[in-house]
Amino acid sequence: EFVLIKGLLNKFDYTVSAGYTEAEDCSDFTTKYLKTSIENIFQQHGLRPVQEYMRDKCDKNLVVVAPTGMGKTEASLLWLNGEKGFYTLPYVVSSNAIYERIRDRYEYKDVTILHSDSMHYYFEDQVNETDSDGYEKYQKAKLLSQPLTICTVV
């Protein structure tokens, strides 16, 4: 219990210190925008077996082992089912690619990226007009307040 309370107090302290009044941005619980977007795109050729399995088992804890190209990324996003999630990858380049895929292909705006170079990444997006306020997105990523955070293993 102590760790949970300490973690919440730290999060609230960081949130208020950053000038925000809310610790969490609205989640995808009710609209399930990301899940719906993925299903709509895959409607033409259908979900792969691993994607169907994870979508149907979203109330279970799962470990998925599958070769490259089997659809694990979308399967994990379907498994989230609108819940808050952290998608962790080993490399910055991989994190950037998955972030862009989720943001652009599925038009999901409630995703942030957090790694050693994410501040630079957000400012680059701001310069390229992909994002309007890079610093604010970076702060929200650091607060872990968005429904989906793409990050690297430290």
Q: Which residues does each PLM region occupy?
A:
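N-terminal helicase ATP-binding lobe
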Residues: E1-V154
